[in-house]
Amino acid sequence: MTGRAMDPLPSPAVAAAAEAEADEEADPPATGPRTSQVTEWRALDPGRMQMPQGNPLLLSYTLQELLAKDTVQVELIPEKKGLFLKHVEYEVSSQRFKSSVYRRYNDFVVFHEVLLHKFPYRMVPALPPKRVLGADREFIEGRRRALKRFINLVARHPPFSEDVLLKLFLSFSGSDVQHKLKEAAQCVGDEFMNCKLAARAKDFLPADIQTQFAMSRELIRNVYNSFYKLRDRAERIASRAIDNAADLLIFGKELSALGSDTTPLPSWAALHLSTWGSLKQALKGLSVEFALLADRAAQQGKKEENDVVEKLNLFLDLLQSYKDLCERHEKGVLHKHQRALHKYGLMKRQMMSAAHGREPESVEQLESRIVEQENVIQTMELRNYFSLYCLHQETQLVHVYLPLTSHILGAFVNSQIQGHKEMSKVWNDLKPKLSCLFAGPHSVLTPPRSPQEDGVCPH
């Protein structure tokens, strides 16, 4: 995955290559004086990627530790009318920073862009799609949920959680958070530039890193496919519970309408007038229980949407961000490294041709270009190894999240148990009220009996 093997670089040359790129990227074109607030944000940033003691490649987090980093709520606030169209704002509240700020979708877009710029070798979750014309409430609610999943995954990601960009996004209450985010991102290069171990990433990688990467990628692809199907089934189960609630409510309303009917009976039915009156009274009273049944079914559906489907979506978002990262590795730094090697080979052949043709000036120019290209290749090789280093850590992070499966299954089982228990209680409370519906000879109640009561044993 790294292209043609390069000769090992002496450590001073490696450090020099990294420092040269750091100097180049860390000093962008002047954009005017920086505000004192941005300086303050940078001072708060511990983000020179301080590594723990021991092997820095290995993560030591548990799922509970990641979940405890922060919980961020994203709630809709009433729509405001712009010049032409309405726009949606969100109230974003962080437990960790004890902050509550207003953000628009475009603020999330800029935050996503600067994260990708600073952390190109990490799992940056995707954003939900931009609003389309005629977007309905269902679309807006779905996007709110997706934004909440995005910001919680970011807030719990180890490098992101300690970065100034996250603190800015979650707690800056000024008028233009987008400008502040871009300004903060311009002040520093990407993670490769700021990580003290970037130039030595290769030293920490296992010898079979390429094999491990291929195996992990295949495993996570299979896990994603299975969880995608589980999410679809869970959505259908929750949707059926909500549909069941609507049907039960209509069922009860129709019983109530039947019991409230005041149409006079024909003369020949006068003998049964008292019976029909009792039946109507009973039917009318049943609507209360059916409304309660509908409420219980709706609660179960909503609970499974929040506790099961949303957690499945969160895990799928994480897995998708890992798949996206693998693609960035292959199409980004790896592809650039291979192109640099190819260009280097062409230059060598051109120099050999010029030497045979006895063209001293051409040879000298080509030698200078070859030296420059060697520096490019050295830097690209360092970036490639650092990308693999980050990929290895991100793979570990996915595995830290795997126990979320048990949380999801537990929530599903508990929801089913609680839902059926509550529904059963209402059905049992309803049954005695059916007594007047079963009037037999001499007004003796004769409700239908079960097969066991009839002495029939089902086969």
Curated annotation (Swiss-Prot):
Keywords: Endosome, Lipid-binding, Membrane, Phosphoprotein, Protein transport, Transport
Name this protein carries in UniProt: Sorting nexin-8
SMART domains in the record: PX
PANTHER family referenced in this protein's UniProt entry, alphabetically: SORTING NEXIN-8 (PTHR46571:SF1)
Positions of modified residues (Phosphoserine): S450
Residues modified to Phosphothreonine: T446
Keyword Membrane: yes
One MF annotation (Gene Ontology) recorded for this entry: phosphatidylinositol binding
One of the GO BP terms on file: early endosome to Golgi transport
PROSITE patterns, A to Z: PX
Membrane topology annotation: Peripheral membrane protein
Primary localization: membrane
Function comment: May be involved in several stages of intracellular trafficking. May play a role in intracellular protein transport from early endosomes to the trans-Golgi network.
